[in-house]
């Protein structure tokens, strides 16, 4: 199942710069693991925002939730998920 996932990171005022940097390092590693496993198919940065647009390929809604909640920055994110289906005009 393919999903369009839009993630926006909201950095809380007053967060320790060291904690945020550590979370970013861990986030990058986890994102790499999910891409290498084939679950995180595409990842694009949104210009001018601390956000991304991604395509995930997973077996279920529950699996997607598990993967997204495993991201170290998950507690700081607003996430919008859209399930995708093949378009009848696709060639």
Region locations from a protein language model:
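Conserved, structured core segments of small domains
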Residues: 1-91
């Amino acid at each position: 199942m393919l999903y369009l996932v839009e993630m926006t990171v909201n950095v809380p005022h007053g967060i320790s710069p060291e904690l945020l940097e550590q979370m970013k390092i861990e986030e990058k590693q986890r994102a790499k693991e999910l891409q290498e496993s084939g679950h995180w198919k595409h990842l694009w940065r949104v210009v001018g925002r601390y956000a991304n647009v991604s395509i995930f390929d997973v077996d279920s809604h529950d699996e997607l939730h598990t993967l997204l909640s495993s991201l170290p920055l998950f507690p700081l994110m607003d996430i919008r998920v859209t399930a995708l289906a093949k378009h009848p005009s696709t060639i």
